[in-house]
């Protein structure tokens, strides 16, 4: 079985400048997210062979063939579709306060959508002794997970955009496509999973 992102994408050419920029971007992202200086120093340059082994590129008769993963990571051929973000005044979509479309490579979409939500949600504070700790109204780790899962696990064969809607009482992340066959919201609430 092959995954959608490992399928070759028709009519897209691989440019060495795009491959170099992708390798650089992925390395910089890894360095930025490293937990320590030691980990940062251990991060090596990425190579075309690594992209091939990960299924980002395919090799056929000495030619590099782009996959949908390559298109999403380099933001080419309309992939990934834009992420639509909005803040609504109340508990419905009648009046929006702010909106933004994020049209970027998939790794930037995750980060920019996450930062957008953090900018728009309320922040409070908790005091421990003489120290103040800022606390978001929603857990940032959960927000990041929702957004990353929506982008990574969406059905890219379905048209449409991922929508991130912040209401006065909740955050909704909507992804095109439906649930897997045999999965219903009721079953999910009872712990059912196809994973």
Segments the model singles out, each with a brief description of its role:
Residues 1-195:
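Active-site helix-to-loop segments that bind/position phosphate- or nucleotide-bearing substrates
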């Amino acid at each position: 079985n092959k995954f959608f992102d490992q399928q070759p994408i028709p009519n897209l050419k691989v440019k060495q400048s795009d491959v170099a920029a992708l390798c650089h971007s992925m390395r910089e992202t890894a360095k930025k997210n490293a937990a320590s200086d030691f980990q940062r120093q251990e991060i090596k340059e990425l190579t075309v062979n690594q992209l091939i082994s990960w299924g980002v590129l395919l090799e056929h008769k000495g030619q590099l063939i782009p996959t949908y993963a390559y298109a999403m990571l380099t933001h080419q051929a309309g992939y990934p579709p834009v992420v639509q973000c909005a803040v609504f005044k109340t508990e419905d979509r009648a009046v929006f306060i702010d909106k933004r479309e994020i049209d970027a490579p998939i790794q930037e979409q995750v980060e920019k959508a996450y930062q957008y939500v953090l900018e728009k949600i309320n922040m409070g504070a908790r005091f421990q002794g003489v120290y103040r700790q800022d606390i978001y109204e929603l857990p940032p780790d959960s927000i990041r997970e929702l957004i990353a899962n929506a982008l990574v696990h969406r059905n890219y064969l379905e048209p449409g955009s991922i929508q991130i809607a912040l209401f006065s009482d909740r955050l909704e992340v909507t992804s095109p496509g439906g649930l897997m066959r045999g999965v219903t919201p009721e079953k999910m609430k009872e712990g059912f999973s196809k994973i």
